Amino acid sequence: YRKGASVIRMLHSVLGEEVFKKGIRTYMQTYKYNNACTQDLWNSLKSVSCVDVATLMDCWVNNVGFPIIKVSLTTRIGGDPVLVVSQERFSAAHKCNDGLLWRVPISVCVQAIRQEDGAVTQVTLPTVILAERSLELSLPSGLKFSLKPSERCFVKMNPGFVSYYRTEYSRELSLCLEKGIADQS
């Protein structure tokens, strides 16, 4: 039941408050005196949004468990920082790479330094769906990201904890986030 509630919360976040409520009202009105199945709920939510809800949710309903999202920072040619985000099935007992994939809504909060004035600023990147094994996310232009803890830069995956996954940060990103938490940034 915990996974179900968490997955519905995640879907609510993807669709937004008003669209989610409208979809639920549509579902309840359509099936108020009838039997319904999961696909009926997905269809009702899709009818009021531009999201293919069935495709998004199928892996969450049919896959056992949930993913671990691994994140690291690399630099492109030219010096632009890029977040590399990858997924695999989470297993507390052992390394598990069985090929399962989820469609994971990825949201990221980045604290970095504005190049124009050197001020520390926080930016939340637009949510993207990680549907493959991995993807690269460019940081916004005009920001300098440093792995030196003294620079007060960090990456926070899943702000608000609305998506259902665990996060494993690279050693460098973990140290930066720890420093940000200690400084209460």
Q: Language model features by range: what are they?
A:
Residues 3-10, 18-22, 29-185:
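Non-catalytic accessory/interaction domains
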